[in-house]
A protein has these predicted regions:
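Conserved luminal/periplasmic juxtamembrane motif of membrane-embedded glycan-processing enzymes
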Residues: 1-165, 173-178, 190, 271-279
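Active-site-proximal, structured, solvent-exposed surfaces of multi-pass membrane proteins
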Residues: 130-279, 283
Length: 286
């Protein structure tokens, strides 16, 4: 019953009771052992997604057994304040939206790891679909099979590395989002925004392909140097549907016009208009 508090507070949150979400979200969560039916409720044991999704604060409800802040089992989170019945912890390793990786893992290789290993691995390597590996393997190193397990110290070290190549700015509106980044070589910039067919992207004003990364999210290629990245979303079929609806209205208006002209030129014969009748029930004598 507390899933949607952040919606009232005006804060984006990875926890929500919401059944209308992109299909890629439904694909992603089961891959790391998280049930996703009508709500997103990742447990704290799945630590890496708090950093991957750029979570900055964690709200821990005050209960009779938790009257004083005693810390939480998320590395890098420190006590910040207590407000509105919640102990608030701040992520001192919070990542900006948009960052790069030097290492990748193919989707088929990813499937060989356990669900518990997969979650933390998301901070160490970018998961690429098998058909995208050939295109981007020249810019990134393949993850060695022996380094897929991570400790809390490893997790924070990877956060530090991701922060070094993060976007300088990130803004969003109702149509999409815009980011800037500086890189020293060609790479993919990852955004923890769910992948959908309605997205299009430009880098420095030129259209680029959007790659599906980390099972259900997006990444775009950038060249070395400064890059301005713009993502724009258009609901698939919305424009075509609007045009078809407009065309239908035009045809209907044309039909009414033609029918009106025809009726004026070919009026129906006038008939007597009868309002009502009456009759007698009395028998007529012979």
């Amino acid at each position: 019953d507390r899933d949607n508090y952040p919606m009232f507070w005006g804060l984006p949150c990875i926890r929500a009771f919401h059944s209308i979400v992109p299909a890629s979200i439904m694909e992603f969560y089961p891959e790391i052992g998280v049930t996703r039916d009508v709500a997103s409720r990742p447990e704290r044991s799945c630590k890496a997604i708090r950093y991957l999704f750029s979570v900055r604060y964690y709200f821990d409800e005050v209960t009779p057994d938790n009257l004083e802040p005693e810390g939480i089992d998320l590395p890098g989170f420190s006590y910040y304040d207590t407000q509105n019945g919640f102990h608030i912890y701040k992520n001192d390793y919070a990542l900006p939206m948009g960052f790069t990786f030097d290492t990748y893992v193919s989707r088929s290789q990813w499937e060989t790891y356990s669900e518990s290993d997969r979650c933390n691995l998301l901070l160490r390597a970018l998961v690429l679909e098998d058909d995208a590996v050939e295109t981007y393997q020249k810019d990134m190193q393949k993850l060695p099979d022996a380094v897929h397990q991570m400790s809390d110290e490893d997790l924070l070290a990877e956060c530090t590395e991701r922060a070094k190549t993060a976007c300088d700015s990130f803004t969003y509106n109702s149509k999409g989002f815009h980011a800037t980044i500086s890189t020293d070589h060609e790479n993919l910039v990852f955004f923890s925004v769910p992948w959908e067919e309605g997205w299009s992207a430009e880098v420095n004003g030129e259209p680029v392909a959007i790659e599906k990364a980390d099972i259900g999210f997006m990444a775009v290629p950038v060249a070395a140097g400064d890059s301005e990245i713009t993502f724009t979303y258009h609901t698939p079929g919305l424009k075509a549907g609007a045009l078809l609806s407009l065309g239908g209205l035009v045809l209907f208006a044309g039909y009414l016009t033609v029918a009106g002209i025809y009726n004026k030129r070919h009026p129906n014969p006038k008939t007597e208009s009868i309002c009502c009748v009456d009759y007698s029930t009395e028998e007529t004598a012979n």
